[in-house]
Amino acid sequence: MASPGGQGGGAVSTRGAGARRMKWALELSLGNARGRGDRQSNQGDVMYPIGYSDKPVPDTSIQETDKNLVEKRCWDVALGPLKQIPMNLFIMYMSGNTISIFPIMMVCMMAWRPIQALMSMSATFKLLENSNQQWLQGLVYSVGNLLGSALAIYKCQSMGLLPTHSSDWLAFIEPPQRMEIMGGGMVL
């Protein structure tokens, strides 16, 4: 510390016309002034501030944040198939019920994605192993994929691709006749 008498080297500063003012300074190094190269060689000479500890303190807030991020990521994976259902409904509406290449391609993709996700479920569950709610997340993931498959089956049925009448299996039964045929607001 600089002495109050003004003999502390840089402790006294002069301003203006002879006005002397005292500056207080606290030197944390016990030795003389050293260069940068000397700092690493004499580490024992340094006085640390009050409350300083050389031991690393584990940061529990990072571990807590990591657990929350893992839970959030697992729920994102589990809810992924359910988030695709509104888009699939929109695609079903836009593709129509006619049998052509575009609607059939949409139905194939709608059916293949959930089946592929259900077949690779073990790889998905490896990601969910760190979660506390693994079983609930797995159930939500399975239900979402089953709903996606059900939408594809419904679209196939509405297009007339599923064998739902007995005439589809038996050759001697006549197919059902349409009672009324309409097209574009005109009677045919």
Curated annotation (Swiss-Prot):
One example of a Gene Ontology biological process annotation: protein insertion into ER membrane by stop-transfer membrane-anchor sequence
Keywords: Endoplasmic reticulum, Membrane, Transmembrane, Transmembrane helix
Gene Ontology cellular component annotations, sorted alphabetically: EMC complex; endoplasmic reticulum membrane; membrane
Subcellular location: Endoplasmic reticulum membrane
Cited InterPro entries: TMEM85/Emc4
Membrane-topology annotation of the record: Multi-pass membrane protein
Cell inner membrane is among the record's keywords: no
Claim: Coiled coil is one of the keywords in the record: no
Residues exposed to the Cytoplasmic side: 1-71, 126-132
One Pfam family here: EMC4
Residue spans crossing the bilayer: 72-92, 104-125, 133-153
Membrane side Lumenal: residue ranges: 93-103, 154-188
Subunit details: Component of the ER membrane protein complex (EMC).
Function noted in UniProt: Part of the endoplasmic reticulum membrane protein complex (EMC) that enables the energy-independent insertion into endoplasmic reticulum membranes of newly synthesized membrane proteins. Preferentially accommodates proteins with transmembrane domains that are weakly hydrophobic or contain destabilizing features such as charged and aromatic residues. Involved in the cotranslational insertion of multi-pass membrane proteins in which stop-transfer membrane-anchor sequences become ER membrane spanning helices.
The family this protein is said to belong to: Belongs to the EMC4 family.
Protein name, entry field: ER membrane protein complex subunit 4
